């Protein structure tokens, strides 16, 4: 994401102009735009025209509109963002108050104005515009006949390809059908890797599986690369890291990222930090339950006692339609930071973020036990905030 202009007043009202450059920037934008904001961007509008002879026709024109935002729709697979609202500035083609939907486009700037820019939103802009926050991990999670090729970016886990091939069982004295199907499966996975992984950006490619599938696959891939003189694979061989996974399904990626070998290799990535924080929370819940709590009310009480060491919070909570509720989460984040606590904002599009959402989306590891919390502990997961 490129920051063109930022103009925010002392009362935190103001506007920023940004240019989305990567598909992931649409996800950042989705987390920035809220109902009631005003969005100015280039868009296509179908307009009716009347010729001198009186015949009526229609054509599509490009124009710039400013909308008061009423609805936001994000397609996570296509990374497309549509913003619906009413026109609030005079325009040659669109009446004031008329509805329109802008589909934000890569490499076209937009200007977003808010009455109140909070700290969480401003931090997201800072992160989105920092080139160090780019996609740098890929993963091939596989078992015999099934593979998922994923990109692990700082904000989301994207499934780029799913490969499925029926592998017949080995028969006594005749393994040829099994071996041919397995080779066909491996070849399709290799093709998917070359098609979907940008080797110039990705620092590490995890190949994870149960049993010996990963070793057999990597042996096949590099033997074929030598035979065909595939420089792309041979030059990037050192980036491939083989690790254990319980299955070839996407959910196995969480356990892969928890693997100590992987964690040390990916220690500088946000995704690995999220996974470790959630893992630490679960360990504390098991071994020191008086220092691990989840649910907004419990976590707020812990914060009042200045007991929070690490706050785990899902980014979907900052998209809450109710401004007062959203502000409550922002105040919690600001307060934990002021008290020298660590804040981990989890992406709801990461496997770890999905798990945190099942724990109400907010949890905390405490510096010390808070007796009142332990006494009053109830089923936090039933809270509806």
From Swiss-Prot:
Presence of the UniProt keyword Secreted in the record: no
GO biological process: cell division; nonfunctional rRNA decay; nuclear-transcribed mRNA catabolic process, no-go decay; nuclear-transcribed mRNA catabolic process, non-stop decay; regulation of translation; rescue of stalled ribosome; ribosome disassembly; RNA surveillance
Transmembrane segments: none
Cross-link for Glycyl lysine isopeptide (Lys-Gly) (interchain with G-Cter in SUMO2), residue positions: 162
Keyword Hydrolase: no
Positions of disulphide bridges: none
InterPro entries reported for this sequence: eFR1_2_sf, eRF1_1_Pelota, eRF1_2, eRF1_3, Pelota/DOM34_N, Ribosomal_eL30-like_sf, Transl-rel_pelota
Cofactor(s) required, per the database record: a divalent metal cation
Phosphoserine sites (modified residues): 374, 380-382
Keywords annotated in UniProt: Cell cycle, Cell division, Cytoplasm, Isopeptide bond, Metal-binding, Phosphoprotein, Translation regulation, Ubl conjugation
Example of a GO MF term: ribosome binding
Pfam families assigned to the protein according to its UniProt record, in alphabetical order: eRF1_1, eRF1_2, eRF1_3
Location in the cell: Cytoplasm
Superkingdom in the source lineage: Eukaryota
Any one Gene Ontology cellular component term annotated for this protein: Dom34-Hbs1 complex
Main localisation: cytoplasm
Role description: Component of the Pelota-HBS1L complex, a complex that recognizes stalled ribosomes and triggers the No-Go Decay (NGD) pathway. In the Pelota-HBS1L complex, PELO recognizes ribosomes stalled at the 3' end of an mRNA and engages stalled ribosomes by destabilizing mRNA in the mRNA channel. Following mRNA extraction from stalled ribosomes by the SKI complex, the Pelota-HBS1L complex promotes recruitment of ABCE1, which drives the disassembly of stalled ribosomes, followed by degradation of damaged mRNAs as part of the NGD pathway.
Subunit structure: Component of the Pelota-HBS1L complex, also named Dom34-Hbs1 complex, composed of PELO and HBS1L. Interacts with PINK1. Interacts with ABCE1. Interacts with CNOT4.
Family: Belongs to the eukaryotic release factor 1 family. Pelota subfamily.
The name this protein goes by in its record: Protein pelota homolog
């Amino acid at each position: 994401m490129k920051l063109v202009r930022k103009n925010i007043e002392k009362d935190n009202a103001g506007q920023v102009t940004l240019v989305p450059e990567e598909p992931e920037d649409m996800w950042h934008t989705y987390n920035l735009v809220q109902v009631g904001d005003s969005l100015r961007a280039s868009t296509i509008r179908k307009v009716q025209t009347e010729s001198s002879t009186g015949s009526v026709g229609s054509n599509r024109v490009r124009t710039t509109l400013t909308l008061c935002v009423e609805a936001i729709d994000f397609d996570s697979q296509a990374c497309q963002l549509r913003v619906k609202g009413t026109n609030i500035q005079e325009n040659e083609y669109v009446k004031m108050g008329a509805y329109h939907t802008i589909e934000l486009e890569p490499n076209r700037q937009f200007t977003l104005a808010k009455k109140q820019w909070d700290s969480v939103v401003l931090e997201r802009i800072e992160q989105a515009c920092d080139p160090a926050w780019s996609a740098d991990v890929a993963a091939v999670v596989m078992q015999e006949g099934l593979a998922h090729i994923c990109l692990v970016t700082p904000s989301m886990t994207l499934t780029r390809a799913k490969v499925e091939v029926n592998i017949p069982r080995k028969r006594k004295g005749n393994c040829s059908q099994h071996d041919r199907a397995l080779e066909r499966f491996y070849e399709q996975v290799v093709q998917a890797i070359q098609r979907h992984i940008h080797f110039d950006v990705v620092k590490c490619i995890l190949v994870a599986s149960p049993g010996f599938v990963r070793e057999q696959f990597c042996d096949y891939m590099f033997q074929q690369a030598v035979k065909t003189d595939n420089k792309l694979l041979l030059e990037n061989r050192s980036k491939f890291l083989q690790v254990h996974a319980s299955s070839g399904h996407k959910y196995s990626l969480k356990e892969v990222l928890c693997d100590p070998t992987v964690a040390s290799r990916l220690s500088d990535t946000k995704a690995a930090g999220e996974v470790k924080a959630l893992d630490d929370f679960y360990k504390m819940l098991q071994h020191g339950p008086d220092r691990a709590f989840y649910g907004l009310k419990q976590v707020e009480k812990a914060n009042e006692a200045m007991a929070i060491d690490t706050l785990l919070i899902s980014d979907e909570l900052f998209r809450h339609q109710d401004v007062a509720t959203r502000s409550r989460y922002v105040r919690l984040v600001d307060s934990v930071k002021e008290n020298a606590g660590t804040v981990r904002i989890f992406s709801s599009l990461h496997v770890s973020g999905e798990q945190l959402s099942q724990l109400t989306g907010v949890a905390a590891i405490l510096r010390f036990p808070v007796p009142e919390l332990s006494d009053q502990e109830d089923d936090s997961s039933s809270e509806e905030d």
